[in-house]
C-alpha cells in the first residue's frame, strides 16, 4: 500500500495544474471479526467486500461486527494540504478511527460519507486506518424492517481525497459538493444555478469559475466571479440557449465544472448532468420534456448469487443488459439507492429511475418499521437528504421514494412522513416524491405520486378482481397520480399441475407466478389510469428470513441464469426492438395427463403451433398472449411454435409417467412466514 500511494504521489507532482487528487483505497485491507479479539489471523481483502456471500439458502448468515484495517504512508509534502477519506457504502453502521483517534460514525448502509482526517494524520509516516462495521439491526437506523439481506462490510469503494485548504467541499452530505439546479427548461433555453459548497482554511474569499460543456465538447457557458466565503453555499446562475434536452430517446449529457483560483487553479470538480423537465398529472401521465412516457418499470434489489451485496461494474452491466432485453424503460432502486455506477449508466442509456429512501416495511407481521423516537426520525431524515444530494445531478433519477408499504396502526406515522416529504421538496423542488402503498387512508395523500402495491388474487379472491379494484379507484380517486406495482413468487424448481393452486410459504410454483402475471397484464397493461407499471421484481434476491433463503418474486433467478416464463411475457409486451416467441412451462417436460393445453407469448403476430405433424388451433387471449384448448397427446411429442422467422420448441413426454419427487429445502420452525 505504501508503494501504491507513493506511485500516485509522483503522478500528482507531475500534474501540477490539478491540485485535487483522489487515490483509491480498495487494496491492502485486513479483515477480521470483532469476536476474534485480535488481528493475528486477519484475512487480506479487496474492496468491495462483504462477509456474507452465501446466497444459496443454507441459512448461514452473519449479523455481527467486524474490523477493517489499512495502513497508509502519507508524505510529508502533504502537510500543507487537507485529507479526506470517503466511503461509498458501508453496511450498516461504520465507526472510523485514524491512528487510534476517533474520527466519526455513519449510520446508514446505502449512502456515501466523507470525513476529514487532516488533524489525525502523521505526515511523513505510516498511518493506521480502522473501520468498525456492523450489520446488526438497530432500532434507530433505517431500514428496521426488510426481508432483503443486509450483507455487511465495506461493500462499495473507498478513496482518499487530497485538496488545498480552500476547496469544493467533499463533506456536504457525502456528495461532490455541487448541485446543478434546473429552474426553467424548454427547447429554447435552460436557466438554472449551480449550488457550490466550500470548505476553507481561513480565507474569506476566493475566485470561482463555472464552465458548462455540451455533449459535443463545446463550451456553452462560462462565468468567473469573486466569492465571499461565509459558511453558506455559493450560488452561480447560468443559462444555456438551444439546449440538447435529456430524454430516454436522446440521453444528452452536459459537463458542469467548478474551479477555484485566479491565475492558478487550486481545486476543480466536475459533474455530469442532463437538462429535462418532469411533469406528472392524472390526465397527462408522466411526461419528460412535455412528452408522455408510459413507464414500464422493474424493481431492482441489491445482490446476486456470486457477489452477495458487494456488486461491481460487471454485475450492474449484466443486470442492465437483462433489463433492456426485457424492454423496461425504468427501474426502481428498492428500499435504498444503488451505487453511483448504476445511475451513471442509466444517465447514458436513457433509463428512468425511482430511488427509494430506506423507510420500508416487510410483510413479516412481527416487524416494526417505525420507532417514534427522535433518533429514528433524525436518521431517516439524514439518509433521505444524503440520497437526494448524492444523486441530485443524475437526469435519469426522476422521483424520490419516501416510504414503502408502511402500516397505519400503532404510532401515527403520517406527521413524520409529511416532514420527510417537505424535506425532499426543500432540497429538490424539481422532482416529484413517490410512495408505494398497500394501505387505505391519509398515508396515500402525502407524496406527489402514489404507486399501489396490489396482490388481489394471489392468496385471496381471483386475479380478475383487480379490475373491480381498478374501477373503484377510478370512480373515487381518479384525481390521484397513480401507478401500480405487483408481483408474486415463483420458483422454477417448484412444479404445479394447475396454475390455480394457492401458494404456500414453502411451495411457490412458477406456474402460479406465470398465471398471476398473465392475468394482471391482461387487465392492466396500457391502462391510462396509471402513469406507470412496476413489476416486483426483476431478479430474485437474497432473503435469509424466507424459505430457501431467497425471495422468489423475480422474473429471473438470483444467479441470473434462468429467465422465468413471466420474463418473456413482458418482453413480448415491452420490447419493441426484438420480437418474442415463447412457449410457457417448458421446464415441465413430464406430463402425466393426456389432455394438454399450451400458452404462447408472441409479439410477432399469431403463432402457428405444431404438436408433431398436427397443427393446433390457437386463439388470442390478450395482447401478445395466445392459447390452445386442451388436446389429447400421448408419448414423446415435440411442440413447435412458429411466428414469421421466430421458432420455439419443447419435447414432452405425455401419458402415464412417474412424477418427479418434489424437492424441498430443510424444514424451518422459526420466523413467521410472509404473505407474499
Annotate each predicted stretch with a short phrase:
Residues 122-124, 195-281:
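Extended acidic/polar, glycine-enriched regions
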Residues 23-25, 30-36, 58-59, 63-171, ...:
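Accessory beta-strand-rich segments of carbohydrate-active enzymes
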Residues 19-56, 132, 138, 159-160, ...:
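Accessory carbohydrate-binding/adhesion or oligomerization-edge regions at the termini
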Residues 320-322, 330-562, 566, 570, ...:
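Substrate-binding/catalytic cleft of secreted carbohydrate-active enzymes
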Residues 189-226, 234, 595-616, 636-642:
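Beta-strand-rich binding/interaction modules
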Amino acid at each position: 500500500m505504501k508503494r501504491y500511494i507513493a506511485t500516485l504521489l509522483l503522478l500528482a507532482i507531475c500534474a501540477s495544474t490539478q491540485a485535487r487528487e483522489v487515490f483509491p483505497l480498495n487494496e491492502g485491507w485486513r479483515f477480521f471479526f470483532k469476536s476474534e479479539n485480535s488481528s493475528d489471523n486477519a484475512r487480506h481483502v479487496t474492496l468491495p467486500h462483504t462477509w456474507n456471500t452465501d446466497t444459496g439458502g443454507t441459512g448461514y448468515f452473519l449479523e455481527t461486527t467486524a474490523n477493517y484495517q489499512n495502513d497508509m504512508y502519507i508524505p510529508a509534502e502533504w502537510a500543507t494540504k487537507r485529507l479526506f477519506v470517503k466511503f461509498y457504502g458501508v453496511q450498516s453502521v461504520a465507526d472510523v478511527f485514524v491512528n487510534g483517534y476517533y474520527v466519526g460514525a455513519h449510520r446508514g448502509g446505502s449512502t456515501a460519507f466523507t470525513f476529514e482526517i487532516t488533524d489525525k494524520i502523521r505526515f511523513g509516516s505510516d498511518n493506521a486506518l480502522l473501520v468498525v462495521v456492523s450489520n446488526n439491526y438497530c432500532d434507530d437506523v433505517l431500514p428496521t424492517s426488510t426481508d432483503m439481506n443486509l450483507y455487511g462490510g465495506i461493500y462499495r469503494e473507498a478513496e482518499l481525497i487530497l485538496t488545498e485548504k480552500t476547496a469544493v467541499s467533499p463533506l456536504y452530505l457525502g456528495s461532490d459538493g455541487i448541485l446543478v439546479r434546473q429552474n426553467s427548461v424548454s427547447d429554447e433555453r435552460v436557466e438554472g444555478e449551480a449550488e457550490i459548497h466550500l470548505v476553507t482554511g481561513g480565507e474569506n474569499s476566493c475566485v470561482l469559475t463555472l464552465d458548462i460543456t455540451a455533449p459535443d465538447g463545446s463550451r456553452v457557458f462560462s462565468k468567473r466571479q469573486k466569492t465571499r466565503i461565509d459558511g453558506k453555499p455559493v450560488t452561480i446562475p447560468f443559462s444555456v440557449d438551444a439546449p440538447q434536452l435529456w430524454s430516454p430517446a436522446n440521453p444528452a449529457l452536459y459537463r458542469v465544472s467548478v474551479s477555484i483560483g485566479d491565475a492558478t487553479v487550486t481545486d476543480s470538480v466536475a459533474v455530469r448532468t442532463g437538462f429535462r423537465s418532469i411533469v406528472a398529472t392524472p390526465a397527462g401521465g408522466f411526461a419528460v420534456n412535455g412528452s408522455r412516457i408510459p413507464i414500464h418499470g422493474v424493481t431492482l434489489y441489491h445482490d446476486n448469487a456470486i457477489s452477495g451485496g458487494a456488486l461491481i461494474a460487471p454485475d450492474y452491466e449484466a443486470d442492465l443488459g437483462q433489463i433492456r432485453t426485457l424492454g423496461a424503460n425504468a427501474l426502481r432502486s428498492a428500499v435504498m439507492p444503488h451505487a453511483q455506477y448504476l445511475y451513471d449508466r442509466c444517465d447514458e442509456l436513457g433509463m428512468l429511475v425511482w430511488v427509494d429512501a430506506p423507510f420500508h416495511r416487510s410483510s413479516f407481521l412481527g416487524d416494526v418499521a417505525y420507532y417514534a423516537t427522535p433518533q429514528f426520525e433524525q436518521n431517516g431524515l439524514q439518509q433521505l437528504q444524503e440520497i437526494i444530494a448524492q444523486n441530485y445531478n443524475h437526469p435519469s433519477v426522476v422521483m424520490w421514494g419516501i416510504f414503502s408499504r408502511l402500516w397505519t396502526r400503532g404510532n401515527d406515522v403520517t406527521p413524520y412522513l409529511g416532514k420527510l416529504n417537505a424535506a425532499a421538496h426543500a432540497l429538490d423542488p424539481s422532482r416529484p416524491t413517490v410512495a408505494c402503498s398497500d394501505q387505505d387512508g391519509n398515508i396515500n395523500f402525502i407524496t406527489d405520486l402514489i404507486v399501489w402495491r396490489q396482490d388481489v388474487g394471489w392468496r385471496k379472491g381471483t386475479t380478475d378482481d383487480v379490475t373491480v379494484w381498478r374501477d373503484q379507484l377510478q370512480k373515487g380517486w381518479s384525481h390521484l397520480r397513480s401507478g401500480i406495482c405487483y408481483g408474486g413468487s415463483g420458483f422454477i424448481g417448484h412444479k404445479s399441475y394447475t396454475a390455480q393452486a394457492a401458494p404456500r410459504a414453502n411451495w411457490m410454483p412458477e406456474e402460479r407466478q406465470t398465471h398471476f402475471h398473465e392475468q394482471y397484464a391482461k387487465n392492466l397493461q396500457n391502462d391510462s389510469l396509471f402513469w406507470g407499471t412496476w413489476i416486483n421484481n426483476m431478479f430474485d434476491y437474497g432473503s435469509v428470513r424466507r424459505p430457501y433463503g431467497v425471495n422468489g418474486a423475480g422474473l429471473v433467478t438470483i444467479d441470473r441464469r434462468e429467465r422465468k416464463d413471466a420474463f418473456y411475457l413482458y418482453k413480448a409486451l415491452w420490447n419493441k426492438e426484438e420480437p418474442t416467441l415463447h412457449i410457457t412451462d417448458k421446464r415441465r417436460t413430464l406430463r402425466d395427463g393426456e389432455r394438454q393445453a399450451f400458452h404462447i407469448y408472441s409479439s410477432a403476430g399469431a403463432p402457428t403451433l405444431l404438436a408433431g405433424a398436427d397443427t393446433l388451433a390457437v386463439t388470442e387471449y390478450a395482447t401478445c398472449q395466445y392459447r390452445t384448448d386442451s388436446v389429447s397427446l400421448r408419448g414423446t411429442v415435440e411442440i413447435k411454435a412458429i411466428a414469421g422467422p421466430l421458432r420455439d420448441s419443447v419435447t414432452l413426454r405425455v401419458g402415464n409417467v412417474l412424477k418427479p419427487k418434489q424437492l424441498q429445502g430443510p424444514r424451518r420452525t422459526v420466523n413467521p412466514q410472509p404473505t407474499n
